[in-house]
Every structure is written in C-alpha cells, then in structure tokens.
Amino acid sequence: MKRFTRDEIAQRVARDIPEGAYVNLGIGLPTLVANHLDASKEIFLHSENGILGMGPAPAPGQEDEDLINAGKQPVTLLTGGAYFHHADSFSMMRGGHLDICVLGAFQVSKTGDLANWHTGAPDAIPAVGGAMDLAIGAKRVFVMMELQTKTGESKLVGECTYPLTGIACVSRVYTDLAVIDIHPDALIVREMADGVTLPALQKIIGLPLQAA
C-alpha cells in the first residue's frame, strides 16, 4: 500500500485550516504545515517562544539567526507579525485564544487522549515543553504522526500506555495511511492513502472504524 509522505500529510492538514484561524504548530513534523498553507488565506501562525504571524521556512541563504521557532528552526515573519515575551505567549495558549494547534504524538487513544512528551523509557529525556498548555488551551487539537511505530504497532490505541499530555483533547489525527476523526463513540475515517482499504486499516489499528 502507498503511504502519504510527510509533506503530503502537512498539505492535508494545511487544507483543513480555515481563513482567519490562529494556529500553533508544534515541534517536529507539524512545522511542515507552514510551507503548505494557501497564500490566499489569512492564517496567523503562533510559536510558543513568542511569535505571531510566522511565515514559512526561509529560502537557503536567507536565514536570520535571530528568527527561529520553538524547535530552533529558521522561520520568516509575515507583514504585521509580532514578537513578544514567553509569558505572553503562554497566556495566549492557556487562555483559549488559539483556534487550532497541530502536535506530534507517541500515542493517541480512541477517546482522544494524547501522549507526546515521554515514552517512559529509562534512557528517554522527558520533553513536555508547552504541549500540555496547547492540548488543553487550543479550541481544536490536530495530531500529525506516522500510524505505526518502527516495530509495527499502531500509535492509535484503545488506551494510552505512555504518560498523558492531555485527556480527550484530540479531534483529528493525520497519518501516513489515513485521516481519522475522533468522536466520543467512534473513530471515523475521512480519507485513506491510495491502495488502503478500511479492513486493512482496521487490522493495523486493531479498533473498530467507521467510514465517513
């Protein structure tokens, strides 16, 4: 079966972000979304280190060492963009002022619980950052992730076994095989990669799925 590439996943997320939305892009895979937003839409990107009005990655050779996102990657600033204190940034996150946040994940449960800061492994370095604030503070939480671990287990699970970031906070999951909405009583498959069938997807995930 064919899988969506990381950029294709980012394109799919970008397509679902509406005009006028205030959006935080988490560290890692979610940062790719900035490069695929429709230029005709006015969308305000927020970074927790204190940026609002963040643009896409700069062209090679045009990087500004003083302009980076929370993941320390070079970014650009759109006309009208602003810098501000870290405390003000977290006030925006915690105060319910963000319409959408896009986060990566180690696990997402069938009820929308999110685990994305620690695997519990003794040699792993916990890195919660602002994820808990975003997971609870944003009006909607989108997750971008590969559906399976390196050993083939589904990251979409009945119940998270890793430490939780937030409870019942994830509304939609974008993966390399499918886009899945999380509802209190069902997992609804919105879209699948070419060659992927609902029975095959259900076998990988191991949970009941419904077609949209």
Protein language model features and the residues they cover:
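N-terminal active-site beta-alpha-beta segment that forms phosphate/nucleotide-binding
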Residues: M1-L78
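Conserved phosphate- and dinucleotide-binding cores of soluble alpha/beta proteins
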Residues: F4-E8, A59-A212
